[in-house]
């Protein structure tokens, strides 16, 4: 009822002939979580909607393979275009920053300007690869975050501006075009593998 009331409220003050309704959920790489929500909401009488919006942060919401498979299955299941309406990655590690080494390992890229750009290129590429041009784009949250003296949290290392207010190379990920998309340029994503290690012996990595 609350979601439907929000849709009706927006429709009452907007041009209903142009307004589109998006359902925005987190957990962009968790298909079964999202399916459970949509199926439950539709059974409960969710009004029609036009777009699916997802949040995807690679250190929280699953692997890049999870994201790709989730988006493909949602398109097949609900026949709605999809956008990534929240995504971000760190451009550095710092004491007060948001990304630590554990999250950096989960995301699979270093917390650096180059790593930030690569994550964004990968998320853009996955979105563009959806069948029938159903991937509509990617929004960054929050590009204008800038480190300030004694600031911590998201501002410290998750924006697209460095400590001097200069735009970093991650912005170039948004010059992406569907026509210029090259699947061969993707990073290879490896699934988890079992590994046995012994103290004092170098591990043989797969």
Predicted regions and their residues:
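Aromatic-rich peripheral "rim/lid" segments of glycoside hydrolase catalytic domains that contact
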Residues: 69, 73-76, 92-122, 126-206
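Glycoside hydrolase catalytic-domain groove-lining segments
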Residues: 4-23, 32-104, 115, 121-135
């Amino acid at each position: 009822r609350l979601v439907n009331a929000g849709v009706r409220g927006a429709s009452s003050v907007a041009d209903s002939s142009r307004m589109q309704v998006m359902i925005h959920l987190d957990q962009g790489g968790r298909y079964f979580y999202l399916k459970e929500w949509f199926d439950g909401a539709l059974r409960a009488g969710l009004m029609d909607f036009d777009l699916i919006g997802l949040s995807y942060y690679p250190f929280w919401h699953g692997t890049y393979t999870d994201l790709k498979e989730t988006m493909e299955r949602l398109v097949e299941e609900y026949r709605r275009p999809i956008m990534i309406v929240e995504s971000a990655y760190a451009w550095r590690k710092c004491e007060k920053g948001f990304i630590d080494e554990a999250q950096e390992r989960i995301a699979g890229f270093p917390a650096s300007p180059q790593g930030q750009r690569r994550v964004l290129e990968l998320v853009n590429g996955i979105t563009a690869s959806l069948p029938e041009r159903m991937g509509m784009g990617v929004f960054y949250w929050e590009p204008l975050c800038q480190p300030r003296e004694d600031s911590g949290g998201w501002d410290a290392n998750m924006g697209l501006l460095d400590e001097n207010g200069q735009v970093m190379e991650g912005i170039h990920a948004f010059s992406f075009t569907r026509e210029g998309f090259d699947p061969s340029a993707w990073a290879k994503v490896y699934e988890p593998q079992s590994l046995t290690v012994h103290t004092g012996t170098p591990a043989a990595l797969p």
